[in-house]
């Protein structure tokens, strides 16, 4: 796991056709990891990339296990963090299934305001599951107040 001290990162995967699919952006104050790989030791199916200069605090699995044993409040903190991650994942899945492109973009701008100027537009489009052209149209409509 890594704690983002400075910078912004993305977690993504690449499908068989070579298309990237972004699952998460993580900026200052966020934790980033492939939790499944981290906890099971299996190879990750995700890539994590810094989108700008970044400073991270890395926590190895063995250090994580030691901290969990030694400091009960640390275990409580991570339990809450993982619960919140599960809730966010469920909300994102529901959003991808039920919301329009405009609704997804508006929620993105409210949930991740720090990303708007720091993340390339094609990556934001990938995250919300729309084409670059659709995102451009949404941004234009929003800028003229429609």
Placement of each model-derived feature along the sequence:
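Cyclic-nucleotide recognition modules
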Residues: 22-79
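Short alpha-helix-to-loop micro-motif enriched in aromatics/charged/Gly
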Residues: 17-20
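Glycine- and acidic-residue-biased ligand/ion/polar-headgroup-sensing regions
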Residues: 3-12, 28-29
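Residue-level recognition of specific faces of alpha-helices
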Residues: 3, 22, 47, 85, ...
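Residues that scaffold the ATP/ADP-binding catalytic core of kinase and kinase-like folds
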Residues: 12, 34-35, 66-67, 108, ...
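Alpha-helical bundle regulatory/interaction domains
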Residues: 63-64, 74, 78, 83-89, ...
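Localized chelating/binding microdomains
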Residues: 1-4, 55, 95-98
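Phosphate-/nucleic-acid-contacting segments
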Residues: 99-146
């Amino acid at each position: 796991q890594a704690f983002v001290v400075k910078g912004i990162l993305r977690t993504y995967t690449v499908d068989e056709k070579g298309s990237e699919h972004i699952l998460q952006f993580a900026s200052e104050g966020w934790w980033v990891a492939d939790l499944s790989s981290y906890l099971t030791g299996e190879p990750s199916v995700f890539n994590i990339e810094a989108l700008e200069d970044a400073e991270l605090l890395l926590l190895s699995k063995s250090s994580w296990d030691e901290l969990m044993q030694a400091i009960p409040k640390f275990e409580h903190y991570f339990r809450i963090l993982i619960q919140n991650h599960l809730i966010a994942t469920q909300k994102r899945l529901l959003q991808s299934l039920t919301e329009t492109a405009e609704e997804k973009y508006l929620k993105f701008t409210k949930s991740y305001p720090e990303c708007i100027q720091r993340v390339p537009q094609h990556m934001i489009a990938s995250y919300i599951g729309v084409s670059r052209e659709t995102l451009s149209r949404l941004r234009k409509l929003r800028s003229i107040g429609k």
